[in-house]
Amino acid sequence: MQSFLKLLLSYRIAKMNTTIETEVNYLDQSVESSLYRNGKVYTFRDTDGNDSNWYGAKLTPQKVVINDAREKNHTIDANGFELINAPLLKENLDFLDLNDVVKNYYPQCEDILKKATHASEVYAFDHNIRWKSANEQQTQITDGQQIQQPIYVMHGDYTISSVEDRIYALGKPLGDNDTLKKFLEPGAALIPHNVISKIFDEKKRFSIINVWRNID
């Protein structure tokens, strides 16, 4: 599910006392910031969920030290991410079956986020599976999109402007690229009008939060 904030889910974690030094790709300082979507740095996604090339992006590797966050007590409010012990409610959940994921995992993700954030409304609306070897074999999710490659660059899924556009679009009839279109009535929206009104007219707070789970 699709960085403003990321909620990382972890279960049955083995104790690991490691610090890793590695290189991570960042946008070069010469590239104009696209925080507000300047139309100069972007990528496209087709209806199968495939990522295109990066446009306008000059990448520079930076050395970083990665610590084991499982030994810390990070929270969404203080750190922007949180590790949560959340075993699957359906043990035999098939992550390669779109119908199984939407019907049996989306509701669990919504419940996890409600408890973690105390939000009054939560809507799961999309997800990706990133799996290098399966992507190379062009593995397709049943009734869904193609499995994706990992993205080897630090990035945000939305800009400050595009995040509002995405929420607004979810309050309209869903389009061909929307995962949930086939699960709703024709012409239906995911987010009710009264919720959209609270966000844009009453200026209520909102965020898009990623839920990550290791499924290998």
Curated annotation (Swiss-Prot):
GO MF: oxidoreductase activity
InterPro entries named among the record's database cross-references: AsaB-like
Alphabetized NCBIfam families for the sequence: CmcJ_NvfI_EfuI
This protein's name: Uncharacterized protein in dcmA 3'region
Record organism: Methylophilus leisingeri (strain DSM 6813 / VKM B-2013 / DM11)
